[in-house]
Design a protein with these regions (language model features):
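Receiver (REC) domain active-site loop signature in two-component systems and cognate sites
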Residues: 60
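Active-site residues of response regulator receiver
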Residues: 57
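Acidic, metal-coordinating helix/loop segments flanking the phosphotransfer/catalytic sites
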Residues: 35-53
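Non-catalytic signal-transmission and effector/linker regions of two-component phosphorelay proteins
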Residues: 1-8, 112-129
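Hydrophobic/aromatic residues positioned on beta-strands within the core alpha/beta folds
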Residues: 82-86
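Alpha4 helix (beta4-alpha4-beta5 surface) of REC/receiver domains from two-component response regulators
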Residues: 67, 88-106, 114, 118
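Acidic catalytic/metal-coordinating carboxylates
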Residues: 37-38, 64-68
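Two-component/phosphorelay signaling modules centered on CheY-like receiver
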Residues: 16-34
Length: 129
């Protein structure tokens, strides 16, 4: 069963090692993946209706994941995204002040690659229905 065929994922995380790992793992699973370590580069190359899922680090130097997700959603309002983060609770609580639904969109680091696989498959499968 090749449910990953044709699914496009965008990854934005300032940790290059993690970005490379996620990209290689997801490509091995059959996804088409674009990965960026700079949120501004990701934003400048983003196009509407290209990605089935966007995975964003929550805490990045140039622009946090919430800001980036808002800018991406201005381009593609139906965008499906999740934040992957190891940010501390205080940082997340501060972001939740203006984004009360933030918590339901967070995947916490560290995580196992199988967790990524299961979560992505669930998100994309449920989104197709």
């Amino acid at each position: 069963m090749s449910t990953t065929k044709g699914k496009n994922i965008l990854i934005v995380d300032d940790d290059e090692d993690l970005t490379d790992l996620y990209e290689a793992f997801l490509k091995f699973d059959g996804y088409k993946v674009d990965a960026f370590t700079d949120p501004l580069d990701a934003l400048s190359s983003f196009r509407k209706d290209v990605y089935d899922l966007v995975l964003l680090d929550l805490k990045m130097p140039q622009m946090n994941g919430v800001e980036l997700s808002q800018k991406l959603q201005n381009i593609d309002p139906n965008l499906l995204f999740r934040f992957i983060t190891a940010a501390n609770k205080e940082y997340i609580e501060n972001l939740k002040t203006n984004n009360p639904d933030l918590e339901k969109n967070i995947i916490y680091k560290p995580l196992w690659l199988n967790e990524i696989r299961t979560t992505i498959h669930s998100l994309l499968y449920n989104n197709d229905q």
